[in-house]
Amino acid sequence: MSLQGQIALVTGASRGIGRGIATELGKQGVIVVGTATTQKGADAISEYMNASDIKGCGLALNVLDATQIEQTLSVIKSKYGEVSILINNAGITRDNLLVRMSEEEWDDVLATNLKSVFRLSRAVLRPMMKARQGRIINISSVIGSTGNPGQANYAASKAGLIGFSKSLAREIGSRNITVNCIAPGFIETDMTEAMSAEQREKLLRDVPLQRLGQVSDIAAAVVFLAGVSAAYITGATLHVNGGLHME
C-alpha cells in the first residue's frame, strides 16, 4: 500500500508520540487528521501541520463518545475521503497500587486505552473492507508485556491491545487489512527531561542501548508498518524499547 495520498486518522496527536507520528506520516505524503480532546489541542495540531506543509487538520474528539467518533469520521470522509490508516495512539494513566485503586481509576484507563480502540477500529472497518486495503496500528507499551507496580490498569489495557490486534488481524486478513501493535519503551518526553541524573541512570540500567527512545523512533516504526514494505506483516507487536524487553 503506497502511502502517498492515503488518509490517516491519528488519535492523541497534539503532542509527544502522536504528534511525531502525524508529522512523519504527513512527510510521506499521507493526508493526516489528528485528534485531541479539546478544540485548543485540535487547533494546535492544525497549526503544526500547516507549518510543516502537511495536508490535513486537527479535530477535537472524545474517544469515549461513540457518537463523536461517527461524526468525526463523517467529517473526514466529506473533506478527504475514507480513512485507510488508523493509528490508535490516545491513552491515559491513573497509577495506583491495586489495593488502593478505585473502580473509577480502573474503568477510566480501560475505557480510554482499550474500549476506544474497539470503537474506532470497528468504525473504520467497513470502508477498509470495501476498498480491500487498510492499516490499523495500535500503540501499546512495554508495560503491557512486563507489567509494572502501580500500573495494573494500564498494563491490562496495553496487554489487551496486543490480544485485540491478533484477533482482529485473523478476522480481516482476507480483505488485505493488516493490524499490528507498536510497544514503545521509555521515550524522551517532557516528563523524562525533568528527571535528575540519578533518576535517569536508574531508568536506563536495564536498557541495553543505554538511552531513552526518541519520538522519531516510534514514528519511523509506524511509517514502516503503514507502508508497502510491511504488507505481509499482521498480528505482530513491534517492540521499540532499546532492548528493555526482548521476545
Predicted segment positions?
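Conserved glycine-rich Rossmann-like NAD(P)H-binding loop of the short-chain dehydrogenase/reductase
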Residues: 28-44
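Substrate-binding pocket helix/loop in short-chain dehydrogenase/reductase
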Residues: 97-98, 102-110, 192, 203
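Short, small/polar-rich loop/turn modules that mediate ligand/substrate recognition or access, typified
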Residues: 173, 178, 233-235, 241
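Active-site helix of classical SDR
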Residues: 121, 157, 165
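Alpha-helical segment proximal to the catalytic Tyr-Lys
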Residues: 126, 170-174, 231
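Residue(s) in the substrate-gating loop at a strand-loop-helix junction
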Residues: 141
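Conserved glycine-rich cofactor-binding loop
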Residues: 7, 14-16
